Design a protein with these regions (language model features):
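Structured catalytic-domain cores with a bias toward divalent-metal coordination
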Residues: 1-201
Length: 201
């Protein structure tokens, strides 16, 4: 067991495609487990879990040129590692498309954000990433109560917006707009929440 999973940090190591990023696991002094599944995918498990624990995914970098959320995620992970930020919920951090980030572009061949449904698409780098991420998400949520699952997909606006910070709650086949989630959003002093009631990309 090593003292640290990363040469520099989760973000820097995930983006350094010239270096391997082998899977590994460490437990820090307070009992929190850090489990690196693969490049860009890190699970954080608190020392204590029960039936009330949430299972939260924080994904970013689905659009490779939206880098601010990646820095935010990296800071959260560093704060958890140092013990500054206590963690009571099971977490999965995802940096989705390191190759696109390194290319300073939104995507390479196809918009990754449009590939997470069950339709058939032509084979692209992004389709392979989407299929892998869907498997990772399914594995993370396996045997967990549906009402304890949150997925926060972090983006940053590339155009001027009326609201500096906002949440988009997409239309889904499953109930995802829980009171607890909305209270969490409110606690973050987000400017606005947009409830999308029609399919969107």
């Amino acid at each position: 067991m090593t003292k640290n999973l990363f040469r520099q940090s989760f973000l820097f190591d995930s983006l350094n495609l010239e270096q391997e990023m082998p899977a590994g696991e460490i437990t820090v002094a307070n009992g929190t487990v850090f489990k690196l599944h693969e490049r860009g995918v890190l699970e954080v498990i608190p020392s204590t879990l029960d039936e009330n624990s949430k299972h939260i995914i924080l994904s970013c970098g689905v659009h490779g040129n939206e880098t601010a959320p990646m820095e935010l995620v990296d800071k959260i992970i560093s704060d958890i590692q140092s013990g500054f930020q206590p963690v009571t919920e099971r977490l999965l951090f995802i940096i989705a498309h390191p190759e696109s980030t390194n290319a300073h572009t939104r995507f390479l061949e196809m918009n990754l954000n449009r590939l997470f449904d069950d339709k058939e698409y032509e084979a692209t780098k992004e389709l392979a990433i989407a299929q892998n991420l869907k498997r990772i998400v399914a594995d993370f949520y396996q045997d967990t109560p549906s009402d304890k699952r949150w997925h926060l997909d972090l983006h940053c606006a590339i155009r001027l917006s009326k609201h500096y910070t906002f949440v988009v709650s997409p239309k889904t086949r499953h109930p995802v707009r829980s009171k607890a989630l909305m209270e969490f959003v409110a606690s973050g002093h987000i400017d606005a929440v947009m409830f999308s009631n029609a399919p969107s990309s």
